[in-house]
């Protein structure tokens, strides 16, 4: 959830910040996640296959995401998609029509509850596109990479915590 709050703080418009940021300070903040990864080999976050097509005062998103943490429980998604002028990120509320969460295929890192996400003609208001022309997609991806690194470090620590006593008892 904090990655989403950080992205909204850094790039969200005043309207987006007013609508979503205060909920992260509540006793029970919303479960929120970022969906960038796509299910293909050698995934490049700068060459997205998920598309967002402008349609009047909204965008229509189509595509698939993989390894989306907390996807089944998320109330708020930041979804990366390709638009005419390059990659963009959209704020999508959980339960939106056309947004489907798949089964949990993850082996090992079950604590993050990673699941695939399918977007089938998901309509999003144009005001839910992150940023006001100042959005830096590369920096957004870099922050997401840091989150993945912290997940990997935590997993390695859990392995050490488990293996140390096991080896000592053998």
PLM regions: where:
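A short, Trp-centered hydrophobic/proline-enriched beta-strand micro-motif
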Residues: 27-39
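Glycine-rich beta->alpha junctions and the first turn(s) of the following alpha-helix
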Residues: 101-170
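A short core secondary-structure module
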Residues: 64-102
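Short glycine/proline-enriched turns and hinge-like loops at secondary-structure junctions
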Residues: 44-46, 70-74, 110-111
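Internal helix-loop-helix
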Residues: 1-29, 68-76
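Short, solvent-exposed loop/turn elements at beta->coil junctions and helix N-caps
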Residues: 37-41, 66-67, 104-107
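Residue-level signal for inorganic ion chemistry
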Residues: 13, 79, 90, 119, ...
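A structural signal for short hydrophobic beta-strand segments in well-ordered beta-sheet cores
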Residues: 50-53
